[in-house]
Each structure stands twice: as C-alpha cells, then as structure tokens.
C-alpha cells in the first residue's frame, strides 16, 4: 500500500506500459535498498529472536508489558522475513520474478507488520501510563489474559480489513512485473494514502508524546520506585518517541509531501520522478525499527543498568567513571 495503486506489475523493459507510465528510472534505488535490507535482515533477525526468547522468560501474571513487546518484535520478524524477496525485487530494477500471488502476500505482510508495530508501540505507552499514573483504577485490566486478548484484537484490526479487500488492493495480474507500485498514482489511491498517513503517524505520535509527558510527570511524584526503575521507565518511553520521530517520521513526512504534491502539481509524472528517490530512501529507513525495537528488552530487565552497560559500552564506561569519581569524593571526605 504505497505510492501506488496496488494494481501492481508492469514489464520492466517497457517503461510506458501500465504501472510505469512515467518512465521512472528504477535503477536509482537498485543498490541502496538491497544493501540496506540485507543489513537489516542479517542483524535484525537473530537480534529479534534473542530478544523474544528473553522476553518470554519475563512474562509474569503481574507484568503484562512483555506480552506487548513480544508482539511488537513478532511484527518486526514478519517484516524481516519478507526482505529476501524485496532484495531480489529492487536489485533487479523493480522486477518481481515470483508471480503475482506471492507479491500480494509479501505486500500484505510487509504493511501489516508496519502498522501492527505502530499500534503495539501505542499500547506499550498506554500500559506504562496506566501502571504509573493510575495503578489502582486499571489494575484489573493489567493481567496476562486481558493482554493476550488486546494483542489478538490488534492483529485482527490490522489484518482483517486488507484481507477482506484482498483482490481489490492487490489484484492478481499475470502479465505484470511491478509489485505494489503504479506510476503515476491515481486520485482515489492518493486520498487513501493521505488518510492512512494521518491515522498511522500524526494521531499515534500525538498519543505517545502526550502519554510520555503525563507518565514522566507522575513518575516524578512516586517515591516507592528506585532511581534505576524510574530511569528504565523513562528510557523505554523516550525510545518509543525517538523511534516514532526518527524512523517513522521521514517516511510519513515525505509521503505527505508526495501525495499532496500529486494533488496540486500540474504534471503528476514530473512530481513522481522528483520525489521518487527521497521517498524510496525514507521507505528503506522505515525498517530501521527492526534493529531498534529489541532494545525494549533491555528496559524490561530488572538488572537494567548491567544489561544496558553490556549492550552499550559507552554507558558502561560512563558508569565506571562515575563510580570512580564517587569513590574519590568519599575518600577525600574521610581524610578530612
């Protein structure tokens, strides 16, 4: 569901055929996207699997947060598993060699994973807010059974609508070789994309930023939590906001520029060519979350400081210097 009416597939060597009437040079992203997706796949797959294994052991009846993070990582894994075929597609100049049905499935899985990840990040922020700001009012909702139902509901909410409209969104056309793309985009699809960009970024970002502010404010007033626990909670919420702004932000911003431009620009093809490279770059970095999301596991560990030090050596060195400074200060005070 991209810059494109999902009526996907055109013959690569004839740029004026259906799907690429603009004659866009698809070699422009033929190195960048395959290399980037290859890096994400090689590093992200084992990283997410290891984090999933660790999170599974953290699930307790009174701690449901790992359930939502596990589902976030499952969404990342689904996305990562589509990369080998996308690597082949982009390396061959947007030429899909695996048939229209596999394109339909890969496109569906890819975007379901993106939007499921966004929804689960919102749920993680909400769960932390309820646990900190309203622990008694919503205690009955913070149990494993309820968390599993919430997770299942999110997957259904994300997957069922496109599945129902499967043939309409991803029509099966045997003679085309573009996948999930058409240039220029059509009016109805442009409107659809602008709506999805609003629902999948502007609203969730406002929701997460608002919860971050309120949760941190409530956290400062709580004396029963240790400084390390507070640091862990703040770190998790800050990571959520950072992922939204730095990873999802460029793609959604350039997407808005692209589709608004298509509505007002006199020549759709000239505009499609102008924004093609920036949009594809942002689309590639959209999957950076597959490397960042496993970091949530660190913030859920009770030995957060030690684990963070092992994963992030710079933090370990800073902690060592801090301890040395503290010991020196205490020693000098003792001599006085």
List each language-model region with its residue ranges.
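Alpha-helical transmembrane segments of multi-pass membrane proteins
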Residues: 41, 71-83, 150-162, 197-205, ...
């Amino acid at each position: 569901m991209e810059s494109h009416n999902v009526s996907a597939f055109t013959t690569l060597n004839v740029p004026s055929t259906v799907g690429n009437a603009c004659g866009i040079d698809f070699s422009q992203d033929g190195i960048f996207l395959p290399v980037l997706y290859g890096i994400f796949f090689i590093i992200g797959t084992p990283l997410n699997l290891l984090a999933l294994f660790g999170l599974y052991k953290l699930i307790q009846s009174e701690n449901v947060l790992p359930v939502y993070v596990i589902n976030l990582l499952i969404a990342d894994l689904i996305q990562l598993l589509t990369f080998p075929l996308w690597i082949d597609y982009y390396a061959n100049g947007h030429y899909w060699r695996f048939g229209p049905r596999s394109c339909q499935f890969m496109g569906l899985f890819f975007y379901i994973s993106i939007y499921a990840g966004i929804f689960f990040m919102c749920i993680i922020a909400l769960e932390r807010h309820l646990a900190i700001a309203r622990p008694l009012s919503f205690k009955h909702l913070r149990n494993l059974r309820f968390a599993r139902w919430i997770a299942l509901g999110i997957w259904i909410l994300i997957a069922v609508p496109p599945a129902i409209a499967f043939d309409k969104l991803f029509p099966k056309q045997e003679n085309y070789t573009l996948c999930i793309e058409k240039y220029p985009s059509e009016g109805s699809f442009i409107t659809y994309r602008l709506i999805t960009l609003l629902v999948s970024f502007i609203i969730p970002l406002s929701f997460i930023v608002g919860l971050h502010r309120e949760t941190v404010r409530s956290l400062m007033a709580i004396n029963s939590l240790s400084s390390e626990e507070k640091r862990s909670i703040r770190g998790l919420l800050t990571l959520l906001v950072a992922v939204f702004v730095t990873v999802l932000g460029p793609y959604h911003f350039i997407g808005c520029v692209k589709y608004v431009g298509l509505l007002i620009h006199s020549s759709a093809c000239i505009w499609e060519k102008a924004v093609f490279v920036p949009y594809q770059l942002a689309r590639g970095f959209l999957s950076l979350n597959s490397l960042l999301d496993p970091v949530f596991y660190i913030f859920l560990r009770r030995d957060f400081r030690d684990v963070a030090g092992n994963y992030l050596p710079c933090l370990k060195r800073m902690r060592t210097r801090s301890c040395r400074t503290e010991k020196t200060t205490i020693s000098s005070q003792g001599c006085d």
